[in-house]
Amino acid sequence: MIIDNHVHVGWFTDGYHSPREVWYSEMAAGIDGMAVSSTSTCAELYKVVVREMRELIRIGGNRIYPILWLTPKMMKRRYALPFMLRSKVRWRGIKMHWGAHPEWAHNAKLVEWGLGVAKQLKVPVLLHTGNNDNCHAGKFAGIIQNNNDLTFVLAHGRPIEEAIELINKCSNVFVDTAFMPMSDLNYLLDEGLIDKVLFGTDVPINRVYYKDLDTVSYIKNQVDNVRSLGGCNASLIFNHCVYQSSNISN
């Protein structure tokens, strides 16, 4: 079994990626299930997001793990968050992206509110990590240490040294391999942290960076890379999904 823990549908800079397009690309590449958030959220298109998730669930059933991408505007608008929570989508995680929405970095009360949503739903929190200072994995140390009742996933695991330091300090931290250099994955494995690694691809964002490679081939390449590094233990990465354990229906 292979679970892709980092997938998107919706509007992005290169156009629209429909639930059907993404689902069939993943299935054609041999993926068995996927945790997915909608990039349409960044345009605050809440009804579109709900339709996308419902369509994914209609196609993929219990192999879909919907991730609710929170934005500062969503949190502040009186109707938006209640609409998402009452949408009858069974959210399996929440996502917060300091890079796409820098307000998170300087609004601690808003962050606390967002984490409260995760606690209400009893689901993990996916945090984007990246090369911008406000997205460095180490920046989230306080949030993670002060919320040890939540599970956190550091998307991309950047910078890898900071991600590893957090994993070693906090038992509630994982990383996904979306756009992760294989040298970083090798670093994690050398540190004996294979049980903290989730397979992820960031499909369909690959279409922006790898224009000459179709999505199915891109996914297969990622699977092959992980398999070559993980060897006989690669299944520990492929099978791992922290979003499966949510038991709250909205």
Regions found by a protein language model. Give the residues of each.
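Hydrophobic faces of well-ordered beta-strands that scaffold small-molecule active sites
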Residues: I3-V7, M34-V36, P66-L68, R92-M96, ...
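Short acidic/histidine-rich active-site segments
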Residues: G192-K211
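Catalytic pocket-lining loop regions of alpha/beta-barrel enzymes
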Residues: A105-L198
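Acidic-and-aromatic substrate-binding clefts and catalytic sites of carbohydrate-active enzymes
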Residues: W11-S18, S40-V48, L70-R78, H101-N107, ...
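A general structural detector for well-ordered alpha-helical segments in enzyme core domains, enriched
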Residues: E21-E26, V49-L56, A80-S87, L110-G114, ...
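Divalent metal-dependent hydrolysis catalytic cores, especially in the metallo-beta-lactamase
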Residues: N5-H8, D14, E21-E44, R63-T71, ...
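Active-site gating/metal-coordination segments in enzymes
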Residues: V48-P124, S171-V173
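Mid-to-C-terminal alpha-helical segments outside catalytic/metal-binding sites
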Residues: M1-N5, Y16-M34, K119, I194, ...
